[in-house]
Each structure stands twice: as structure tokens, then as C-alpha cells.
Amino acid sequence: MQRINQNMTGYRMPAYVEEILTENYCKNFVRMSIIKDSGKYSFSYKPAGLSRLDPSSMGLYEKLLLIRNLISMSETASDHLIEAESYLIEPELVYSKGGNVDINSLRLLYYPDIKKLEFRYKIVLFADRILNRNIREEREMAERIRSAAEPRDINRLKMFLDKTILRLESNMN
């Protein structure tokens, strides 16, 4: 697969974030290089062995597992000093090995979020974008995710997702 290139102006990336990303210390992100020139950033991603994930071909179980794993990935990124508010979380930026949604197969394209939207809102918006509003069960799930994320406690949302995923797993067996 070829490289993916993005350019950005009007942003200043902390040097430690640049090092963490370019040295691939945090494995949650697609390998990348960064070139700075006169206030302009050029991001070049090398998604070797990865392809963009297509949530439209997934069932509810896989979509919820994807959301839950993105939360776990954000916690790992935070452990590496890259806060979830600092980068975009959108379906187009999620890459995977073989279309799998397990945490070891997923990677994100790091692209700065200038607005620094609160993480719980990003997850709710992500869920809204991947859950199909034409399917009653998925539409209701989007509402439940929104409700679980409302009290500013990401642990509540994690518990809700964990319970729902376990329930769906038991129904599959």
C-alpha cells in the first residue's frame, strides 16, 4: 500500500508528541513521519499491512467492540502522553489488519484535533457515524451510548459497553 499524506497549517505540535509518533512508541497509531516547514506540517503515514476499516459491513457486536477498543486505545495513548482530546477519532481514520476489530489489529491515523473536543463527545459522534439509524437496534444503541457518556464518566460508558458486548456474545453462542 502506498503512503497516505496530509498537510496542516496553523498548528504547533509539541516535540515530545512528534517523537512518540515518529518513533512509534505508541503502537495505537499508524506508523508515520512528520516534516515541519515554516509553520506547515506534512504527515506521511505508512499503513503497511493495514486497510481502512469499513464499519458499514459490520454487525452490532463488532461495532460495539470497535468502540470499546477505541476507548482502550485512547487510554494507552494517554499513558504515552497523547491525550484523546488532541487527535481526531473518526471512522475514516481507523485502520485494521484484515478488517478485524480486536485491539491488536486496530490502528488510528494520527491527525491533530485543533478544537480539542472532549473525548466522550468524540466517542458519541463516532458511534453515531457507524451505527445504522435505519436499524432499530443500532439506533437505540446509539441513544444508550449517548446516555451512558453523558455524566462525564468514561468508566460508566466502558461498563455499559462491556455488559452489552458480553450479552451479545452469550446470544451468539
Question: In which residue ranges do the predicted regions lie?
Answer:
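C-lobe/activation-segment region of protein kinase-like
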Residues: 97-172
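A short glycine-rich, hydrophobically flanked beta-strand micro-motif that places a catalytic Asp/Glu
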Residues: 82-98
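Gram-positive cell-envelope targeting signals
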Residues: 1-3, 8, 73, 170-173
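Conserved structural core of kinase catalytic domains
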Residues: 1-67
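Protein kinase catalytic-loop region centered on the HRD/HxD motif
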Residues: 72-85
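Ordered hydrophobic segments in well-structured contexts
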Residues: 42-44, 88, 105-109
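Well-ordered, non-membrane alpha-helical segments in soluble/globular domains
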Residues: 64-71, 122-124
